Amino acid sequence: CNNAQGRCDGADFKKGPMTQLLIQLLEPLLGYSLADFPESFAYVSETALCAQTKATPARLQPTRGKKKGVETSYFYGNAMTLGRMAFDLAAEVGDSVVAIFFRDTDGTHSSHTGLWQDKWQSVCDGFKHSDFTRGVPMLPKPKSEAWLLCLAGFNPGGTCEALEELSGNDHSPNSVKSRLDATLGRHHSADELCEWLIQHPVAVDRIDSMPSFRAFHEALISAVKNFPI
């Protein structure tokens, strides 16, 4: 946010690489580019979302069974809060709203096999609990740089699924971030990555080989289905 606040929209919203990716994915679905309508975006930071979740009255607080860990309860509760915010925003502006719940999942080799799926399901359950029907989990595995690395030409002629097994730890000698920097020739800022994506339109068929992206893309398509144009 350009206003140094936890919530912003319109001119105060500063897009990042994943927003640029989203713009490109939505254009063929909507028939127009959201880049031409910057006022269409509203942003809630992770800090602001957590604060709102904690401020929710006890009777509306999310409840999870004991078998659900603290981490997945976090995803569930914040998705529920975001869904309620989106529901209220749709009523306020008198228009349809899609809520994107974006988090890097930062998995490591020590993470149990189903952790990503647990987080994904927790976000879906949180949206469902809020009664918001256009909620979309966006959970890159292990993090968004893996999606960008795929688009940058990882494994030419092959698939990118192996990228999801890399460590999300930035201090790892073979981290996703360091590999992206190496592939692009140097470190790129968020603004530079946005510009790079504009110059290199998303190859959906290629990045769709990554299960975490495919799940997100399918959820996005479902959310905008029958969307009023």
Language-model segments: residues:
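Acidic beta-strand-to-loop metal/phosphate-binding motif
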Residues: 1-2, 95-108
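Domain-level signal for Mg2+-assisted phosphodiester chemistry and nucleotide/NA-binding surfaces
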Residues: 1-64, 74
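Well-ordered, non-membrane alpha-helical segments in soluble/globular domains
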Residues: 12-22, 73-87, 110-126, 213
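Acidic carboxylate-rich catalytic motifs and surrounding loops in phosphoryl-/glycosyl-chemistry enzymes
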Residues: 34-49, 137-146, 195-203
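Short helix-terminating capping/connector loops at secondary-structure junctions
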Residues: 35, 90-96, 129-133
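A glycine-rich, hydrophobic loop/mini-helix early in the fold
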Residues: 48-96
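Activity-critical C-terminal alpha-helical subdomain
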Residues: 104-189
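Charged phosphate-binding loop/patch that engages nucleotide di/tri-phosphates or the phosphate backbone
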Residues: 190-229
